[in-house]
Amino acid sequence: MPIKLQKLPAAVRWGLAVLCAAACGVLWAYYWRVFFGLDNRVSPLVVTLGCAAFLEVCLLAGYCVRRFAKGFAAKGAVCIFLCGLLFAFANPPLQTPDEADHYLRTYAISTGHFDFDASRTYPDDVAYLLEAFPGAWVNAHTSAGVGTDPDTGAEKAYNTAGYALKQYGKDGAVQGMADSFALYLAHDVRDSVPDPVSEPVSFLVIPFLPGAVGMALARLLGFGALGCLYGGRIVNLLAYTLLCALALAKAERYRPAFAAIMLLPMSLFMGASLSYDATLLGCYYLMLALLTRKEWNTQTAGIYTAACIFVNIAKPYLNLLWVLPIFLVAKREWHAKGRRPLWALGGFGGAMAVTLLTEWYGTAFRYNYPIIERQGGSTVNGGEQLAFVLRNPLRTIAAFWGTLGENDFFIGQLGLFGWKDLPISFLNLTGPLVLLLAALLAAAQQKRADAFPTRRRVGGAALLALVYAAGAMAAMYITYTPVGMVRIVGLQARYFLCVWLALLPALAVLLRKTIRPAITEEKAEAAIIPLCACYAVFGAVLLFQHYFVGPVYVVYA
């Protein structure tokens, strides 16, 4: 008769878990050593002990969360921060989109410079860091050509796009991100002096403050440019975690959907970077969480308005759409001081005020910059593109639809990391399945008999998501895409994370009416965090693997 694990003493169960983790670590290391030829680069003992120790630490972290974190929001916040730490270190320096510019601006702010001076340069340590880790590292190290296969003697075309690790010749050394670390760490013994690095074309301050605090603390502790990068990432992650924790605490419905999006590898990849998307995404998730509250008091309205104003500092104009959801709260549900139109007007006025103030500040305190060319060159012209769109609406719709189709509607690119140059197929394939699982668990039987949120809230949020997605595409088409081009330049999956979250409640309602899941709300919430945390850990491991372990592209010259 089989032994039921639940009937075993807790100490025995955890002891078995420790043994299983160690065994899995050994098997995992063996897979890396065999499939990626890791024995030629690293000692087998180091790999085996490292993999086993990592899984034991993850198991210990899981035990601590289960034992000490009380409540759904607390458990979710701790998991978000711990999983985010893995992404902060698995992701190599400056490999988040635009992180090189974000690093330079954050570094300047951390040294007390709140203006923008193109003649101001950075320490040599920073210049060495940017030299060793160029943005879009995989693209920067991509090669293509025709070589001869030594086994068959036939000519064979090669293209290393999408591979961070390359091996030139069957017995050649594997080249990859580790070489960049070695290059940077050896800068003290190099004779050459790096080219000076000046301030970037980036004129924001407030969105970079969390990262600047982290950099300042790292500098106080004696760290150099690389340590400042990780310090900034960690404090940025802390800001993302706090916003997510507040969102989970305020959400009254569909909390599995929120936890799943927050723990999605793409969310953690951005949250644990120097990008202002860390706080931007956190504010999006917070505003959507507040829409699940049945009644709004003054505090709820104030938090929503503050988040709405902040997102307009980071991404102006398009984010004015987030003023409108205030009207999704019915009059009978509104208990804040002041009427809804006044709050909406205040949010709109505040958002416009900070937008104009940010633009003025970025111009008034800008020094020694030459004429800033449009991104994309002279072929990009917003006025001409807008006129082209108005003259050719059907062609524009075709361009938008074609862009979505070419990019798997961006829901199939949840595993596209780096500067869109490092695809991880497993995460691309499973990302939509995780969102579907979140919708299924969010469709669980509700505790209360009344059906809430109402169709007005759920449908309104879904409509907002679609309008926001169309607006994001239109903005990129008008401001970043050459006039008349048949596809949109610059769109990325991270822009649509808040869209998927806004659509998940509507999908959950549909699933609840069709398949009627028997799982209760309590069980759904108990299951979602461990499942998504494990998925996030696996995503961080895959990110590390693709940059440092394999696959390795063998180039035959």
Model segments located where?
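Transmembrane-helix signature of polytopic, membrane-embedded enzymes
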Residues: 13-17, 71, 223-226, 245-265
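Transmembrane helical bundles and short interhelical boundary loops of multi-pass, membrane-embedded
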Residues: 23-50, 353-354, 361-372, 518-557
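Transmembrane-helix motifs of polytopic, lipid-linked glycan transferases
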Residues: 60, 230-254
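Interfacial juxtamembrane loops and adjacent helix segments
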Residues: 113-229
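Membrane-interface alpha helices of multi-pass inner-membrane proteins
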Residues: 269-271, 300-316, 320-327, 350
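Short acidic/glycine- and proline-prone juxtamembrane loop motifs at membrane-interface regions
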Residues: 273-280
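Perimembrane helix-loop-helix junctions
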Residues: 290-299, 321-352
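Membrane-lumen/periplasm interface segments of multi-pass, membrane-embedded glycan/lipid transferases
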Residues: 359-446, 554
